[in-house]
Protein backbone atom coordinates (compact mmCIF):
# COMPACT_ATOMS: atom_id res chain seq x y z
CA UNK A 1 0.00 0.00 0.00
CA UNK A 2 2.83 2.41 0.84
CA UNK A 3 4.47 1.68 -2.53
CA UNK A 4 1.21 2.48 -4.32
CA UNK A 5 0.88 5.78 -2.45
CA UNK A 6 4.46 6.70 -3.34
CA UNK A 7 3.85 5.75 -6.97
CA UNK A 8 0.69 7.88 -7.12
CA UNK A 9 2.52 10.82 -5.54
CA UNK A 10 5.36 10.50 -8.06
CA UNK A 11 2.94 10.37 -11.00
CA UNK A 12 1.08 13.42 -9.65
CA UNK A 13 4.37 15.31 -9.24
CA UNK A 14 5.43 14.35 -12.77
CA UNK A 15 2.11 15.56 -14.20
CA UNK A 16 2.49 18.84 -12.32
CA UNK A 17 6.04 19.35 -13.61
CA UNK A 18 5.02 18.58 -17.20
CA UNK A 19 1.99 20.88 -16.97
CA UNK A 20 4.05 23.74 -15.48
CA UNK A 21 6.74 23.26 -18.11
CA UNK A 22 4.19 23.30 -20.93
CA UNK A 23 2.57 26.44 -19.50
CA UNK A 24 5.93 28.24 -19.27
CA UNK A 25 6.79 27.14 -22.81
CA UNK A 26 3.47 28.44 -24.15
CA UNK A 27 3.99 31.71 -22.26
CA UNK A 28 7.43 32.15 -23.84
CA UNK A 29 6.05 31.18 -27.24
CA UNK A 30 3.37 33.87 -26.93
CA UNK A 31 5.97 36.44 -25.95
CA UNK A 32 7.99 35.55 -29.06
CA UNK A 33 4.91 35.69 -31.27
CA UNK A 34 3.95 39.10 -29.92
CA UNK A 35 7.42 40.40 -30.68
CA UNK A 36 7.13 39.16 -34.26
CA UNK A 37 3.60 40.33 -35.02
CA UNK A 38 2.90 43.89 -36.17
CA UNK A 39 -0.10 45.24 -34.27
CA UNK A 40 0.03 48.63 -36.02
CA UNK A 41 -2.88 47.69 -38.30
CA UNK A 42 -5.03 46.88 -35.27
CA UNK A 43 -4.03 50.13 -33.60
CA UNK A 44 -4.91 52.08 -36.76
CA UNK A 45 -8.26 50.31 -37.13
CA UNK A 46 -9.20 50.99 -33.50
CA UNK A 47 -8.14 54.65 -33.76
CA UNK A 48 -10.27 55.04 -36.91
CA UNK A 49 -13.30 53.50 -35.19
CA UNK A 50 -12.98 55.82 -32.19
CA UNK A 51 -12.58 58.84 -34.49
CA UNK A 52 -15.74 57.84 -36.41
CA UNK A 53 -17.70 57.46 -33.18
CA UNK A 54 -16.63 60.89 -31.98
CA UNK A 55 -17.60 62.50 -35.28
CA UNK A 56 -21.01 60.80 -35.17
CA UNK A 57 -21.55 61.97 -31.59
CA UNK A 58 -20.57 65.54 -32.49
CA UNK A 59 -22.93 65.55 -35.48
CA UNK A 60 -25.75 64.15 -33.33
CA UNK A 61 -25.15 66.80 -30.63
CA UNK A 62 -25.32 69.57 -33.23
CA UNK A 63 -28.58 68.19 -34.60
CA UNK A 64 -30.07 68.03 -31.10
CA UNK A 65 -29.19 71.69 -30.53
CA UNK A 66 -31.22 72.58 -33.58
CA UNK A 67 -28.36 73.34 -35.87
CA UNK A 68 -29.84 72.24 -39.15
CA UNK A 69 -26.93 72.92 -41.40
CA UNK A 70 -24.64 70.26 -40.09
CA UNK A 71 -21.76 69.56 -42.38
CA UNK A 72 -22.22 65.94 -43.22
CA UNK A 73 -19.04 63.97 -43.12
CA UNK A 74 -18.91 61.78 -46.16
CA UNK A 75 -16.19 59.24 -46.35
CA UNK A 76 -14.94 58.34 -49.76
CA UNK A 77 -14.85 54.80 -51.06
CA UNK A 78 -11.06 55.03 -50.76
CA UNK A 79 -11.39 55.72 -47.02
CA UNK A 80 -13.74 52.74 -46.64
CA UNK A 81 -11.27 50.62 -48.59
CA UNK A 82 -8.36 51.73 -46.38
CA UNK A 83 -10.38 51.00 -43.23
CA UNK A 84 -11.30 47.58 -44.56
CA UNK A 85 -7.69 46.85 -45.45
CA UNK A 86 -6.51 47.85 -41.96
CA UNK A 87 -9.13 45.56 -40.42
CA UNK A 88 -8.23 42.65 -42.72
CA UNK A 89 -4.53 42.96 -41.92
CA UNK A 90 -5.27 43.33 -38.21
CA UNK A 91 -7.38 40.15 -38.24
CA UNK A 92 -4.64 38.35 -40.14
CA UNK A 93 -2.07 39.33 -37.52
CA UNK A 94 -4.32 38.31 -34.60
CA UNK A 95 -5.11 35.02 -36.32
CA UNK A 96 -1.39 34.19 -36.49
CA UNK A 97 -1.26 34.11 -32.70
CA UNK A 98 -1.76 30.48 -31.73
CA UNK A 99 -3.92 30.79 -28.62
CA UNK A 100 -6.72 32.88 -27.18
CA UNK A 101 -4.46 33.77 -24.28
CA UNK A 102 -1.91 35.19 -26.71
CA UNK A 103 -4.60 37.05 -28.68
CA UNK A 104 -5.82 38.51 -25.39
CA UNK A 105 -2.30 39.64 -24.54
CA UNK A 106 -2.09 41.33 -27.97
CA UNK A 107 -5.33 43.23 -27.26
CA UNK A 108 -3.91 44.25 -23.87
CA UNK A 109 -0.77 45.56 -25.56
CA UNK A 110 -2.88 47.59 -27.98
CA UNK A 111 -4.88 48.96 -25.05
CA UNK A 112 -1.70 49.93 -23.21
CA UNK A 113 -0.25 51.77 -26.21
CA UNK A 114 -3.51 53.44 -27.30
CA UNK A 115 -4.82 54.42 -23.85
CA UNK A 116 -1.91 56.83 -23.44
CA UNK A 117 -3.35 58.85 -26.34
CA UNK A 118 -6.92 58.88 -25.02
CA UNK A 119 -8.34 62.19 -23.94
CA UNK A 120 -10.59 61.30 -21.02
CA UNK A 121 -12.40 58.29 -19.68
CA UNK A 122 -14.99 58.25 -22.48
CA UNK A 123 -12.31 57.60 -25.09
CA UNK A 124 -10.80 54.92 -22.87
CA UNK A 125 -14.20 53.24 -22.63
CA UNK A 126 -14.58 53.40 -26.41
CA UNK A 127 -11.11 51.92 -26.80
CA UNK A 128 -11.98 49.08 -24.45
CA UNK A 129 -15.29 48.39 -26.22
CA UNK A 130 -13.71 48.39 -29.68
CA UNK A 131 -10.96 46.01 -28.54
CA UNK A 132 -13.53 43.67 -26.97
CA UNK A 133 -15.50 43.62 -30.26
CA UNK A 134 -12.42 43.04 -32.43
CA UNK A 135 -12.20 39.22 -32.09
CA UNK A 136 -15.88 38.85 -33.11
CA UNK A 137 -15.37 41.31 -35.97
CA UNK A 138 -12.45 39.18 -37.14
CA UNK A 139 -14.61 36.07 -36.99
CA UNK A 140 -13.07 34.12 -34.15
CA UNK A 141 -15.63 34.92 -31.49
CA UNK A 142 -15.24 36.58 -28.12
CA UNK A 143 -12.14 35.75 -26.12
CA UNK A 144 -13.07 34.05 -22.88
CA UNK A 145 -11.73 35.58 -19.71
CA UNK A 146 -9.92 38.38 -21.50
CA UNK A 147 -9.83 41.76 -19.82
CA UNK A 148 -8.34 44.09 -22.42
CA UNK A 149 -7.67 46.64 -19.68
CA UNK A 150 -5.37 44.74 -17.31
CA UNK A 151 -5.19 47.73 -14.93
CA UNK A 152 -8.94 47.78 -14.32
CA UNK A 153 -10.01 46.30 -11.02
Swiss-Prot record:
Location(s) in or outside the cell: Endoplasmic reticulum
Tissue specificity as recorded in UniProt: Expressed in developing cotyledons (at protein level).
UniProt KW Transmembrane helix keyword: no
Keyword set includes Endoplasmic reticulum: yes
Protein family according to the UniProt entry: Belongs to the 2S seed storage albumins family.
Protein's recorded name: Conglutin delta 2
Organism: Lupinus angustifolius (Narrow-leaved blue lupine)
Keyword annotations from UniProtKB, A to Z: Allergen, Disulfide bond, Endoplasmic reticulum, Signal
Any GO MF annotation of the entry: nutrient reservoir activity
Amino acid sequence: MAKLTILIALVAALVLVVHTSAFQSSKQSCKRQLQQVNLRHCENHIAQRIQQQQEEEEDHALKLRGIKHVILRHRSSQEYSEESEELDQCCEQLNELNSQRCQCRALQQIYESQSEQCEGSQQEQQLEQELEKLPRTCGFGPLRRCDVNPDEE
